[in-house]
Amino acid sequence: MKYLLIFLLVLAIFVISVTLGAQNDQQVTFNYLLAQGEYRISTLLAVLFAAGFAIGWLICGLFWLRVRVSLARAERKIKRLENQLSPATDVAVVPHSSAAKE
């Protein structure tokens, strides 16, 4: 449910940016690192929003992957430690009373 709400929020922002850009058909000069270009506002908004969205997903995906690898490593370590512990607990301890009943 949470992901559906996030998706709908992102979709609403994208639709609003395209709608606002479509109503403003004027050309703007966009200065980027190596050059500059004349673009329509709608195109510029859509491209920049999509690029930001993709970069955000990439960064979040890398963090998620790092957490999953760390979790898998920890689970393997837990399993290995449990396997080391289980042979020691398999030996049954028989209580021995030192006092002999007569």
Swiss-Prot record:
Disulfide bonds: none
A UniProt-annotated Pfam family: LapA_dom
Domain of life (superkingdom): Bacteria
Periplasmic compartment residues: 24-43
Record's bilayer topology term: Multi-pass membrane protein
Coiled coil ranges: 64-92
Effect of deleting the gene: Disruption mutant shows accumulation of a few incomplete LPS precursors.
InterPro entries per UniProt: LapA, LapA_dom
Expression induction or repression: Induced by heat shock, via RpoH.
Gene Ontology CC entries for this record: plasma membrane
Transmembrane portions of the chain: 3-23, 44-64
Segments on the Cytoplasmic face: 1-2, 65-102
Keyword Cell inner membrane assigned: yes
Function statement: Involved in the assembly of lipopolysaccharide (LPS).
Family named by the database record: Belongs to the LapA family.
Protein name as catalogued: Lipopolysaccharide assembly protein A
Source species taxonomy: Bacteria, Pseudomonadati, Pseudomonadota, Gammaproteobacteria, Enterobacterales
